Amino acid sequence: MNKTMIAAALAAGVMFGYSSRVWTQTDQKLPMAGYAPAKDIPGARELPNPEVDYKVVFSVAAVAKPEEIHPTLKTIALYLNTLAHNGVPAGHRHIAAVFHQGGGDAVLANDVYKARHNGTINPNIALLHELKQAGVELRVCGQGLLGKKVEPKDVLPDVQVDLWAMTTMVNLQLRGYVRIGG
């Protein structure tokens, strides 16, 4: 190859965000299509360990813009792909998301969501389903639903209704889950 072709290939890589590392079979089978893993950092010391059993519960309490996917859902997708990208097998990825307070609207059925948000469709539905398919436990606070006058039947079918987010968070942490957020 001549120098011009090499320079063009390198420029294209920089322009489109490709790293210089060799892609592995794992990269082709990331659990969350359309979500890149965290970018590689040359020399980084702390990396996901394929031998560790990751138990993580994300507290989804923040209010999101009604027309946008909840940012914490994107973070969960990125985290799942980062674990997979670094060789952590599916059997070692135990991820839960607990929706409560302002985050509870993200798991509402589309008709209920539209009624609460001036006709806006629930932008979270597809990603929630993909997360569930990737093995993420999706939970919502039953007390929060009562407070918003929402029936359990008005929650998406991929989401488990629990008595109270506080109890869910405590129970998961007692089972060894590490809490992220909220």
Please place each PLM-identified region on the residue numbering.
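Solvent-exposed, acidic/flexible segments
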Residues: A62-T72, A90, H117, I121, ...
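Bacterial N-terminal signal peptides that target proteins for export
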Residues: M1-A8
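Histidine-anchored nucleotide/phosphate-binding helix
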Residues: I69-V88
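Acidic/histidine-rich, surface-exposed loop or edge segments in extracytoplasmic proteins
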Residues: N49-K65, L108-V112
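A cross-taxonomic marker for long C-terminal extensions/tails that follow the last structured domain
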Residues: T26-P37, L108-G182
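Acidic helix-start/capping segments at beta-turn-to-alpha-helix junctions
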Residues: P89-V107
